[in-house]
Amino acid sequence: MWGACKVKVHDSLATISITLRRYLRLGATMAKSKFEYVRDFEADDTCLAHCWVVVRLDGRNFHRFAEKHNFAKPNDSRALQLMTKCAQTVMEELEDIVIAYGQSDEYSFVFKRKTNWFKRRASKFMTHVASQFASSYVFYWRDYFEDQPLLYPPGFDGRVVVYPSNQTLKDYLSWRQADCHINNLYNTVFWALIQQSGLTPVQAQGRLQGTLAADKNEILFSEFNINYNNELPMYRKGTVLIWQKVDEVMTKEIKLPTEMEGKKMAVTRTRTKPVPLHCDIIGDAFWKEHPEILDEDS
């Protein structure tokens, strides 16, 4: 009797197994419809292996955006701090980013050489970074512009470039910081001529046409008593974001076995987070101080 039951159970399981396999095969066949051929038109945008992947974002038409939202000239610390907050959010979301650099309305994000995020597809790198950054800009706006409502959503365009060596990556970041210095020096003199000397924008532009860096420094010092080297490093050098260990103090409720109610106590914990620095990255000192950034296994 028991033997007969075992045979029936075994036969039933075998029947169920055969039926299940048929349904799975049918599902797989249905999933591959006649329309699936359109996937063949997708371009292969895989980034080269063993190269640094850099995503650079730029604000779209930010001159108009800055005017509409009453940004301070030549620099608005609120706007720069908001940009950095957005960049930190991107780095915390995409942890394969080893360093970021930002100035004015742009930010560059460097993914480690061995990253395999998004199967190294350039379109995925660019769209994930751009969407996370833009949504963060809107989300955190009120934290930095309490009295200025956001009149319309900002836009950011992005591009992806791969750099084959440590030196080319360092040269890229040096280029962006040099660009920060050139633009900020010009803007500092330009707006001093307008705000303090009463020149029109056209007149200020004409005054600065053909001048060198030394000439601009001389105008600032002799006419406005401004030593450019004393301007905030955030304005002159931009912002570098790197991962560092930071001690954070938080309040936690601790309940001892002998007590009925818990007590709130300050607890210090250490975590790694993107930390902003305003320092020179063109020279070798920064890279010697932070060798882990270019480490293959960082």
UniProtKB/Swiss-Prot annotation:
Report the catalytic activity.
a 5'-end ribonucleotide-tRNA(His) + GTP + ATP + H2O = a 5'-end phospho-guanosine-ribonucleotide-tRNA(His) + AMP + 2 diphosphate + H(+)
Query: GO cellular component terms?
Result: cytosol; mitochondrial outer membrane; mitochondrion; transferase complex
Which InterPro entries does UniProt cross-reference here?
Answer: Thg1_C_dom (IPR025845), tRNAHis_GuaTrfase_cat (IPR024956), tRNAHis_GuaTrfase_Thg1 (IPR007537), tRNAHis_GuaTrfase_Thg1_sf (IPR038469)
Q: Which cofactor does it need?
A: Mg(2+)
Q: Name one GO molecular function term.
A: ATP binding
Kindly give the Pfam families that the UniProt entry links to this protein: Thg1 (PF04446), Thg1C (PF14413)
List positions binding GTP: 58-63, 104-105
Cofactor remark? Binds 2 magnesium ions per subunit.
Q: Which family does it belong to?
A: Belongs to the tRNA(His) guanylyltransferase family.
Q: What does this protein do?
A: Adds a GMP to the 5'-end of tRNA(His) after transcription and RNase P cleavage. This step is essential for proper recognition of the tRNA and for the fidelity of protein synthesis. Also functions as a guanyl-nucleotide exchange factor/GEF for the MFN1 and MFN2 mitofusins thereby regulating mitochondrial fusion. By regulating both mitochondrial dynamics and bioenergetic function, it contributes to cell survival following oxidative stress.
The record's disease note says: Spinocerebellar ataxia, autosomal recessive, 28: A form of spinocerebellar ataxia, a clinically and genetically heterogeneous group of cerebellar disorders due to degeneration of the cerebellum with variable involvement of the brainstem and spinal cord. SCAR28 patients manifest mild motor developmental delay, gait ataxia, and dysarthria. Some patients show mildly impaired intellectual development. Disease onset is in early childhood.
Task: Quote the protein name from its UniProt record.
Answer: Probable tRNA(His) guanylyltransferase
Native organism: Homo sapiens (Human)
Instruction: Provide the taxonomic classification.
Output: Eukaryota, Metazoa, Chordata, Craniata, Vertebrata
